[in-house]
Design a protein with these regions (language model features):
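Sec-dependent N-terminal signal peptides
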Residues: 16-21
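His/Met- and acidic-residue-enriched segments that coordinate or traffic transition-metal cofactors
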Residues: 2-13, 25-111
Length: 111
């Protein structure tokens, strides 16, 4: 066996080993990836609906949608992660974004 053949074999073996290690995470990655993509698509569509001739109203409407996207993504990560810091940040984000959403919606209803 030539040196080049041994290198190719080693590279293929390493790739196969890494694939085997990754397989348990693939189901999660596919599920979370789909949820994140759905959240982003929903947020983007809602932000476009928020366009308004008044730049202040447009900003407020788009921020409501943006905050909802952050809330949705935080809920996704909470279903999947056990990391304490990420969990705290996601939970805090949900609380703060929900509160700010309400403030913005109140402002929008008055203007």
């Amino acid at each position: 066996m030539t040196s080049s053949s041994r290198t190719t074999l080693r590279n293929r073996s390493a790739a196969a080993f890494l694939f085997v290690l990754a397989v348990p995470g693939l189901a999660w990655a596919e599920g979370a990836d789909k949820e994140y993509r759905a959240s982003m698509d929903k947020m983007d569509a809602a932000m476009m609906k928020g366009m308004d001739p008044d730049p202040t109203k447009a900003w407020a409407k788009m921020m409501v949608a943006h905050h909802q996207g952050a809330i949705d993504m935080s809920k996704t990560v909470l279903k999947e992660t056990k990391d304490p810091m990420i969990r705290r940040m996601a939970e805090k984000g949900i609380r703060e974004q929900t509160e700010e959403q309400k403030m913005l919606e109140d402002w929008i209803s008055k203007h």
